[in-house]
Amino acid sequence: MDISVLIGLIGSLSSISIGVILEGGNPAAVLHIASFIIVIPTAMLAAVTATEAHFVKAAFKEFKFIFKKLPINFETRIDELIEYAIVVKKQGVLALEKDIQNINHEFLKEALSMVVDGSKEEQIEESLEPIIEETEHYYHGASHYWIHAGETSPTIGLVGAVFGLIGALQQLDNPPAMAAGIAGAFTATVMGIGGSYLFLGPWGFKLKAKAHLVIKEQQLILAAVKGMARGDAPGELKLKLTKMITAMPFRG
C-alpha cells in the first residue's frame, strides 16, 4: 500500500469534516445519492468520450497502481546492473545467459538478451527506445483519463445543482420540500468539486507520477546495456547511471 495515498485521502477528508463540525454542520449531509449518481458517473463517462478506448481500459487496469507501492528502487537497480556489467567485463557477454533465465523484469530481460546476442549500441537503442516511448504513451493516456474526469467533475456538479434548483423552485407552495431541494442541489456542487480535487484528479496525477518511475527505470536499463555493449568500465558506468537519478535543485 502506498502510504502517501492513504495519508492524503484520510487527511483531506478529515480536515474538511473537522472544519464542517466546528461550524456546527454535519459532514454526512453531503452524502446525497442522487447528486453522486449525477456527478461522478457522468464525469467518468464524459472522460470515456474524450479518451481513446485503449487508454480507458488501461486507466482501469492500472488503477491498482495508484494505491500500490511500486517495487522500484533506483539504487538497487543500478547495483544489479553494475553486477551484470562486471560479469560482462570479466567473463564476456555469454556469461549473462544463466542470469537472464532468472530475471522476471521483461524489459531488463529483453535488454540483456540483446547484449548476449552481440547487438551493437545503436541496435539496442533502436530496439528498446520505441518500447520506452510506447510505455510512456500508454501511461500518459491512462492517467489522462482520470485527470480529465477530475477536470469535468466540477462542471457536472454545477449542472446537477441547476437541476436541483429547478426542481426545488417548482415547490414554492411547500417551503420544507423546497428547502430540502435547495440543500440537495448544493450537495451536487460539493460532490463535483470534492470528487475532482480529492479523488479523480489526484488519482490521475499519482498514476502519472508512478509512470515516471517506470520510465526512468527503463531509461536506466537502456543506458546500462548500451554501456555494456560499448565496453564501458563498471565504475564509469555506475557514475553515469547515478547521475541520471541525482537531482540538483536550484539554490538561489
Annotate each predicted stretch with a short phrase:
Residues 1-7:
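Membrane-entry signal-anchor segments at the cytosolic-membrane interface
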Residues 4, 15-142, 214-252:
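Large intracellular
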Residues 7-10, 14-27, 134-210:
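Helix-termination/interfacial motifs at the ends of transmembrane alpha-helices
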